Structures are given as structure tokens and as C-alpha cells.
């Protein structure tokens, strides 16, 4: 199980590089993944020390990429992240879940939003699962999700086969309509 929390701790004295290798990456994989995540210059710094919001998210995702969890839990991945980093967070989460290179035209980057129509991309090919807790849903532009559930006052109040339908319903009519069954009835 791999977990990305809203505010990860700083770990002074442990370099990000060492942490990634503890998670299971080889030195070469560590360098390559750090470049993908824009963190190559951070590898020899203490884990999360002095990192911005976006850097924290990227650091956590880098650790999760090395860990290769069977179950990925993301708690508000958009929290404290600018638009540019949301795209990177989403692509990294998608890579963790599917762990597939693009396979098209010599691309060796993680399969991500810019190459989702790649011939070899199949979001259902992975045996990995994920749970994403989100309030704004921006992450759904990058991570294909199969179901949406709304937890409201401790009760699972709305369930749908299409997360984008639920998000659209909430955006247009608010949580109240969804909680009262509007999203389940196909209201958008």
C-alpha cells in the first residue's frame, strides 16, 4: 500500500536519493524517475526539507513510483499544488497505477496524458488499484477513474460508474443534489 498524505513530514539527515532507493529503485531508476518528476536537483537534499507544495507532492509521488504499490491512496493530491504541478501529479499517479511506458515512437516516458491514445496504452491492464480523495477533481483529467463515491456526513451518499458525471453534477448543482440521488439518476 502506498499513501500520499496532505502534508508529509520532513526527514532531516535522510537524502531523497537514499529514500527512493530504500523504496526499491536502483540508482539508475532513481535518477531517471527524478528527472521525470523534475526533482533531479533535490536528490541529495533531506527528504521534503524546504520543499514547496508542488515539490512535496512530486517527492511523495517519486517515492511511490519506486515503491510500486498494489494499492495507491491519494489524499487530496491537488491540495497546495499549482496548475502545472497538478498535471505532473496526475501523470505520475497514472504511471504508478499502470506502470507502462508509452511504447509509441520511441517514447520511454511514463504513460501519461500526452500519450493516452498511444496504441499500447490500456488503463485496465494493471492489477493495481487506487483511491483518490479529491474535492475539485482536477486529477481526473490525468488519471482514468472507473467509479466515484461521495462520502457525506459519514455516509456513502452517491455512487456512480462515471466519476466525470458525478463531478459535472456537483459542479452544476452542488453536493446536495448528488447526495439526494441526482447524480445517480444521470443528472448532469
Regions found by a protein language model. Give the residues of each.
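Conserved beta-strand-loop-alpha-helix hinge in the C-terminal portion
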Residues: 142, 147, 151-181
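Walker B catalytic motif
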Residues: 76-77, 82-84
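Hydrophobic anchor residue at the start of the ABC signature
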Residues: 60-61, 81
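ABC ATPase C-loop
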Residues: 64-65
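Conserved catalytic motifs of ABC-family nucleotide-binding domains
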Residues: 68
Amino acid at each position: 500500500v502506498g499513501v500520499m498524505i496532505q502534508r508529509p513530514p520532513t526527514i532531516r539527515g535522510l537524502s531523497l536519493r537514499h529514500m527512493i532507493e530504500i523504496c526499491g529503485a536502483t540508482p539508475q531508476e532513481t535518477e531517471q524517475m527524478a528527472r521525470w518528476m523534475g526533482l533531479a536537483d533535490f536528490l541529495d537534499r533531506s527528504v521534503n526539507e524546504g520543499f514547496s507544495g508542488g515539490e512535496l507532492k512530486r517527492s511523495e509521488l517519486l517515492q511511490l513510483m519506486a515503491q510500486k504499490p498494489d494499492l495507491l491512496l491519494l489524499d487530496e493530491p491537488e491540495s497546495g499544488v499549482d496548475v502545472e504541478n497538478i498535471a505532473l501529479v496526475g501523470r505520475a499517479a497514472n504511471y504508478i497505477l499502470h506502470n507502462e511506458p508509452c511504447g509509441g515512437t520511441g517514447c520511454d516516458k511514463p504513460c501519461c496524458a500526452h500519450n493516452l491514445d498511444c496504441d499500447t496504452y490500456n488503463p485496465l491492464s494493471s492489477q493495481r488499484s487506487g483511491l483518490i480523495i479529491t474535492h475539485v477533481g482536477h486529477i481526473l483529467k490525468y488519471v482514468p477513474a472507473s467509479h466515484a463515491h461521495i462520502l457525506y456526513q459519514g455516509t456513502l451518499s452517491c455512487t456512480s460508474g462515471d466519476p466525470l458525471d458525478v463531478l459535472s453534477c456537483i459542479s452544476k448543482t452542488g453536493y446536495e443534489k448528488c447526495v439526494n440521488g441526482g447524480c445517480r439518476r444521470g443528472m448532469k
